[in-house]
């Protein structure tokens, strides 16, 4: 069974866990309709990406 050879100090433990926290999702306003959308992704509301219609919106 695996057992740690030495005690891990609180500083090392904190450094290891530094990237474990959840990140806040980034959102931007769509230039076409104003709805919130993920950056570098098509707007799911109007179907536009980078000023062009990529997908016709399903109504």
Swiss-Prot record:
Q: Which family does it belong to?
A: Belongs to the bacterial ribosomal protein bL32 family.
Domain of life, per lineage? Bacteria
Q: What is this protein called?
A: Large ribosomal subunit protein bL32
The GO cellular component terms are: large ribosomal subunit
GO molecular-function terms, A-Z: structural constituent of ribosome
Instruction: Write the record's keywords in alphabetical order, separated by commas.
Output: Ribonucleoprotein, Ribosomal protein
Q: Which Pfam families match?
A: Ribosomal_L32p
**Record keywords: Ribosomal protein included?**
yes
Look up and give the organism this protein is from. Answer: Erythrobacter litoralis (strain HTCC2594)
Q: Where is the composition biased (Basic residues)?
A: 1-16
Question: Which biological process terms from the Gene Ontology are attached to this UniProt entry?
Answer: translation
| Annotated NCBIfam families | rpmF_bact
Q: Where is this region: Disordered?
A: 1-20
């Amino acid at each position: 069974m695996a057992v740690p050879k030495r005690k891990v100090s609180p500083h090392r433990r904190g450094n290891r866990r530094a990237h474990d926290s959840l990140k806040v999702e980034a959102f931007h306003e769509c230039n076409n309709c104003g709805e919130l959308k993920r950056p570098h992704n098509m707007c799911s509301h109007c179907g536009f990406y980078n000023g062009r219609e990529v997908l016709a919106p399903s109504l």
